[in-house]
Amino acid sequence: MVTIRADEISNIIRERIEQYNREVKIVNTGTVLQVGDGIARIHGLDEVMAGELVEFEESTIGIAPNLESNNVGVVLMGDGLMIQEGSSVKATGRIAQIPVSEAYLGRVINALAKPIDGRGEISSSESRLIESPAPGIISRRSVYEPLQTGLIAIDSMIPIGRGQRELIIGDRQTGKTAVATDTILNQKGQNVICVYVAIGQKASSVAQVVTTFQEQGAMEYTIVVAETADSPATLQYLAPYTGAALAEYFMYRERHTLIIHDDPSKQAQAYRQMSLLLRRPPGREAYPGDVFYLHSRLLERAAKSSSRLGEGSMTALPIVETQSGDVSAYIPTNVISITDGQIFLSADLFNAGIRPAINVGISVSRVGSAAQIKAMKQVAGKSKLELAQFAELEAFAQFASDLDKATQNQLARGQRLRELLKQSQAAPLAVEEQVVTIYTGANGYLDPLEIGQVKKFLVQLRTYLRTNKPQFQEIISSTRTFTEEAEAILKEAIQEQIELFLFQEQT
């Protein structure tokens, strides 16, 4: 028989009384009415804020973008397969935020800043709101420092400055991602933090980009944010804002950052899916009415900070895919109107073997020569005009049988200029080497060569200057000007090399 010991019972009661917590908690809760397709309808949650995070019983997190009269529409940040009708939901009182720190460099993360590269957790002591207001007018200054992409066609004719937003636009398979990744590779040793955001891409494509970065040693200054095509629409919608929050963390620490959004049209599609499921009224191409605001609030966060804020910068390169060259579609026109210029990639040029397939004639940078070093301005000033005239002349020459000598010379010069703009992938050039290349072509030194010999000769010339005339590179990098001394060294080197090259080719 069990004996009841009064002292034991009194001890237990005393312990329970001592442990009793008189703190009263008010929790804002609701009930799931309906769930499916990444959307949940919640009854209750009377005091929830727009955009507040809510937590379901089985620990899935959601965001509440739709506050209606009798229910709350919540988008789920997960598959939500375990959420049941009638289960409870509580408001967290927080808006979406992510942890941020230097430890994110070299890592691959998802839209919630959780690592997905299998290399363990990332330590951080700070956090930033995923959506934070863009810098105001007083917090900015005009763009004046160049951000070198390493691609001759861009750095000479469509220059990008630190703090600029430049759109990369073109059909599928025209090398848009290659232009962006080459720009990241060229930031090695430039003290620029890079963030590559992959939205709705194939996992294999993202893996290929990450492998390229690792092989070229670019991961040490790069963060990759990836939400692949099989991710929930909510996470694809959030990924660019996560990337921007990470870039902002470094920008406000007086660092220079570069963010690639690849690509915002996939984000717009994810947002359209969410909006239609939330029963928001559709507009043009079934996108919701605020799809312009979706991209403008993202890209306006790219800025060049004022002197008072330490002159950090965030340069944004959004990539938009067009359907058979139609740049007048809804999303392309929206992003063109938000950005400070665009780089058009043409499928025709790509198929003709001109890579990068940049259509220089219709590409533009609204910052212009303010984002170029003086040496580049001096040698590349007339290149864009010359190429445009050449393209016009080439079209005309197809119908003319006998051309005068001057026209033939102009066509020959144009063909060689176009040839020197060709570059292999993952082989960006330093600005000093670009100056050499453009000067050689623009001043007619390539005219005696066959078109097929141009690339080989330029490689030989750049190697010769690097090894035998290092003072040329020193003058350009220290003065940032194409001085008379630099020109004399270059002229001498070109004449020596062209004679040697022609002799070698003949023998």
UniProtKB/Swiss-Prot annotation:
Stored SUPFAM superfamilies: C-terminal domain of alpha and beta subunits of F1 ATP synthase, N-terminal domain of alpha and beta subunits of F1 ATP synthase, P-loop containing nucleoside triphosphate hydrolases
Compartments where found: Plastid, Chloroplast thylakoid membrane
Keyword Methyltransferase: no
Gene Ontology biological process terms in this record: proton motive force-driven ATP synthesis
Record's signal peptide: none
Keywords, sorted A to Z: ATP synthesis, ATP-binding, CF(1), Chloroplast, Hydrogen ion transport, Ion transport, Membrane, Nucleotide-binding, Plastid, Thylakoid, Translocase, Transport
Family: Belongs to the ATPase alpha/beta chains family.
Site (Required for activity) location in chain: 363
Protein name (Swiss-Prot/TrEMBL): ATP synthase subunit alpha, chloroplastic
Subunit structure: F-type ATPases have 2 components, CF(1) - the catalytic core - and CF(0) - the membrane proton channel. CF(1) has five subunits: alpha(3), beta(3), gamma(1), delta(1), epsilon(1). CF(0) has four main subunits: a, b, b' and c.
Enzyme Commission number(s) from the entry: 7.1.2.2
Superkingdom assignment: Eukaryota
Origin species: Amborella trichopoda
Binding residues for ATP: 170-177
Function description: Produces ATP from ADP in the presence of a proton gradient across the membrane. The alpha chain is a regulatory subunit.
Catalysed reactions listed for this entry: ATP + H2O + 4 H(+)(in) = ADP + phosphate + 5 H(+)(out)
Gene3D superfamilies: 2.40.30.20, ATP synthase alpha/beta chain, C-terminal domain, P-loop containing nucleotide triphosphate hydrolases
Mode of membrane association: Peripheral membrane protein
Chief subcellular location: plastid
GO MF annotation: an example: ADP binding
Cellular compartments per GO CC: chloroplast thylakoid membrane; proton-transporting ATP synthase complex
